[in-house]
Each structure stands twice: as structure tokens, then as C-alpha cells.
Amino acid sequence: MDTIFAVSSGLLPSGVAVIRLSGSHVVHVVTTLCGCLPKARFMHYGNLTARDGSFLDSALTVFFPAPHSFTGEDCAEFHLHGGKAVVNRFLDELSTFKGCRIAEPGEFSRRAFMEGKLDLVQAEGLADLIEAETESQRRLAVMGTSGRLTTLYRDWRHKLMKIRAFIEAELDFSDEADIPNTVSDKVWKDVENLCISLREHIAEGERASILRDGFKIVIVGAPNSGKSSIMNRLAGKPVAIVTEEAGTTRDALEVRLVLGGLPVFLIDTAGFRETDNKIEQLGIEVAKQHVRDADLVILVYDMQNPKEVYLPETSAEIWRVGNKFDLYEENKEPWLIQFSALTGLNFDHFMKELESFCLRRVSEIGNLFPARKRQLQLLKEAVKEIENSVNYDSLDLSLRAEHLRRASDFLGKITGDIDVEDLLDIIFSEFCIGK
């Protein structure tokens, strides 16, 4: 297998650039460039010299012999000065060694998986950790890399395999006196309890999707109620056009924010009203769809001239807020909050309420749940097979056992214990080249 190398420290130029290598030629490459093989897992400082004798850089080198490395192969890292010319010259030198080439995206992690250093859940968690932009996403990724999910899924799979063993024993030795016909009957309660655990885990994963995908907060209201001013103040910059003319916003505008360490997608929509303008009508239909899909709807009213807006059916929480508080006296309308998006009067209170809403929703989520849609889908497939086995007790026992086998295979595919070769290219292509 080729020895692979890549920059693993990010964009250049930088203070330091880390070049990672993995494969059977690492010892030869390191010895040639350093003039010696450094002590394992100790930083070695010295000059790096090309094979033609030219100076490359003064650098730190660390050697990780197999199997005690990230990939399970011989690995090394060169910590160079992070100039583009320095790094490019060093990469060119590495490419001159026989059997050495630039790594493909995710190839280091893929080799770690193939060598049993990572399972698929941990690999996906690692990819999520690299991509994490908020504290909640970081915690979600750490859950995947910790191995706790893997332990849970393997435990469930082991239970299914043990149950199948009882059933198959009855099938294979039904005429033996020491194998009673009621053995398999005793396990179906265990199967039902396992199915309940899986369903609860799936429901937790669907609730927790907001940690990865973000909260969807939609701003709606009548034209000229100040929706775009609210959008701009929340975004901290002008992203929406604000004028006295009604109907300025024709399409939905989206801004990504972080509130309380949680990802939030804020959407400003076209004002709801009767209109003959075809473009504006389309904008209003788009707004209604966003309301249906929202986690929170902020229904904005002009406090001097509050116009009622009729929203489509939605499962989202709806906040009625009064805007333009700087122009009008506090009134008795049932506003949740009153503020001025233009001047910022009482807007801090509104921001704190938004943050509290997000944190409250997160507090309802448990500590262990599927972190990715792939995992969630395979869990649903496993539940479907278990339900087929439990609910159709008139089926031949061998068919019911087959449904349980398929369920355990779906659980095995989550961790990669069952052949998932067709998925590996998709999963590891999400990584950067140096990971």
C-alpha cells in the first residue's frame, strides 16, 4: 500500500505547518530527510535535507511506529515553518520517494478504520468535530468520538444475536428432549423491550437534530411591521432592505447566528397581505412554508397599527411581539415582548428570551442519541425489522428469526461491523485531505 502524505494543519501561510505521513515507507523517508530515525513519540529538532543535499527547513519531527498511531500504520509528522514556498518545496521532495503520494480526502481516517483504530460512528464524530462551529456541535461530535454510541449499538446487536441463538436452537433441535419448544417464546418480551429502547433512542435523535442542523426561527408579520429591522439588528449588520414602502421583502432572507453556543437560522419573510403582485404572492407562499417548518415563529406587530396575520398550521412555538416601542406608549395588547428594533430599546431583553428558548429546548434532550441521519435511518430500518418479527407471530419461526438477523445487520452497519464498503467513499470524502 502507498505511503500517503498531506498538510494536516489547515490553510497557508501560517506560523507552523504540520505535514502528516502514514504507510510502510515512513521509516525510510524520515531517516533520509532527518539523517536519523527519531525516538518514538518524542519531538526531534533538526535540519531537514533533501536527497540532493539541499537544505529544506529547520523543523520538529515526531515518529509514531505501528500499531500505536492514528492510522495503525507507521506515521510521522513534520512541523515546518508555515510559508507556502517552504511547504510546497517539502511536498515536492516527499513526492520523489517511491511509493509516496498525496493523500485523498479522509484517507488517513479511512486507514484508521480499516486497521480497527476507529469505527464508523467514531469516524463520523471526528468529521463533525473538525466541522463544528458552535459549542453544541462540538459536544455532539465528542459524543460520537467517545465510543459511547458504539458501545450502545454493539450491545443492542449482541442482545439480538443472543435472542436469535435461542430461536435457532429450537429450530435446529426441536426433536431433542432437552430443548423445550417454549424456549423462543420466552425471548419475545426481551425483543419488545429492545424495540422500545430503539424507538426512544430514535425519538431522542430527531429532537436532537437541532444541535447539528440548527434552530429555525422565522420572522413574520404584516408589511412594514419592522421585520427586516429586527433581522438586521439580530444579525448585527444590514442584511435586509428597510424602507417605508410596504412589500419590500419579496423573498425569504436567511442569516446564520450563534445563540448560547447553539446554531440558529434566522429567516426574514415577505409581509403577509392580500396582493395582486405575482412575485409578492410567491414570496408569501414561501413564507408560509417556512412557518410550517419552523422551530419558533416571531409574529411582529407595529404597535401603533397592529394588523392581524393568519398563519398556516405549524407545530412551532409562536411569539407575539410589539415593535416600534420607541414611538408609542406601552399598551395592553398581549405582546410577549415590546421593543424597538430601530433604536434597540428593550431589544437586549428580546435577545435573552431567544437564547433562553434555545437553551430550554436543548435541556429537554438526553445525553446519548444518534448524531447523523445515516445512523438514524439504519436505526429505523432495524426497528422495522424487529416490529415485523414481533407483530406477525403467525409467521414461521424461521422467518421471524430472519427479521431479527436483518435488524442486527442494520445495527452492525452503523458501526461498520457489517460490510459497508459502498458507504466508505461517501463517509470519508467529507474529511479534509490531511485527516
Curated annotation (Swiss-Prot):
One GO cellular component term: cytoplasm
Task of the protein: Exhibits a very high intrinsic GTPase hydrolysis rate. Involved in the addition of a carboxymethylaminomethyl (cmnm) group at the wobble position (U34) of certain tRNAs, forming tRNA-cmnm(5)s(2)U34.
Family in the record: Belongs to the TRAFAC class TrmE-Era-EngA-EngB-Septin-like GTPase superfamily. TrmE GTPase family.
The keyword Metal-binding is annotated on this UniProt entry: yes
Cellular location(s): Cytoplasm
Name used for this protein in its record: tRNA modification GTPase MnmE
Keywords of this entry: Cytoplasm, GTP-binding, Hydrolase, Magnesium, Metal-binding, Nucleotide-binding, Potassium, tRNA processing
Organism per entry: Bartonella henselae (strain ATCC 49882 / DSM 28221 / CCUG 30454 / Houston 1) (Rochalimaea henselae)
Disulfide bonds: none
Domain TrmE-type G span(s) in chain numbering: 214-359
Quaternary organization: Homodimer. Heterotetramer of two MnmE and two MnmG subunits.
EC number(s) recorded for this UniProt protein: 3.6.-.-
Cofactor(s) listed: K(+)
Record keyword RNA-binding present: no
Binding site for Mg(2+): S228, T249
GO MF term (any one): GTP binding
Residues annotated for GTP binding in this entry: 224-229, 243-249, 268-271
Superkingdom, taxonomy of origin: Bacteria
Lineage: Bacteria, Pseudomonadati, Pseudomonadota, Alphaproteobacteria, Hyphomicrobiales
UniProt-listed GO biological process terms: tRNA methylation; tRNA wobble uridine modification
Binding site for (6S)-5-formyl-5,6,7,8-tetrahydrofolate: R20, E77, K117, K435
Cofactor: how and how many bound: Binds 1 potassium ion per subunit.
Record-linked InterPro entries: G_TrmE, GTP-bd, GTP-bd_TrmE_N, GTPase_MnmE, MnmE_dom2, MnmE_helical, P-loop_NTPase, Small_GTP-bd
